[in-house]
Amino acid sequence: MNRKNLFSYVIVSTFGAILLEAYAQWLGKLWIYPYLNTFIYFLVFVLGFALYWLMIVETYIAAKVLLDHIYKGRHYVTKPYKFERILYYVLASVGIALIMFGTVSLISDYQNYGGYSFSINEITDYKVNFLYILSTFIGVVFVLELFEYTQHKTSFIKDLLHEYPIPFYSILIAFSVTALIMETENIPHHFWIYINWPYENIKFLGLPVSMFLAWPLHYLGFLSLFRAFTKEDSQEIWRGDLIK
């Protein structure tokens, strides 16, 4: 990776980190960092998430390369279906509506609660509606689908439409391994603590099952973001279609 590509990656990874933390941590209060104060948190923010997203990309690519090898051959498509010319614009419109719904609902709820206070290390007794956060993340993915389509790039939904499910299976494999390793390693140390998750009484390894179910969004969200705003470095992410 040359300097230009590295700079692009850092910009995209930082933007992805801001999206994730803004909705899931700063507003969503889904986890806290008990050992960090605000200064240290922002000091390590860019580097920490650059490494985190790199792990997301590399584990996904590793799973995808393995599955592409097992299921010999790739599925190439020379042109999109006719309905795709409209589909991605519809998805983007729905995505914008979902982002607005989630954001406005979060702000409105905080106003009704009595206001918002920024904290990364304190447990709050206010529980955010998880639907608002989920809506926002799905909305972002839908909007990114249009970005990828207008640049004649492959995308997650396009791969599924053209019967290339390897990216979907790769995300499932990669997130299962990564989540299990990261979460079990964190259990005795509590570098981050999960709070305010839906159905948090249903647990696996002492952690909310709903948290594990949300893990694929880390992959889908950042991989889509990375592909939408970079070129050569992200070509392998959804590659399976050859779009002209």
Q: What are these model-derived regions, one by one?
A:
Residues 1-244:
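Aromatic-rich, lipid-facing transmembrane alpha helices and their immediate juxtamembrane interface loops
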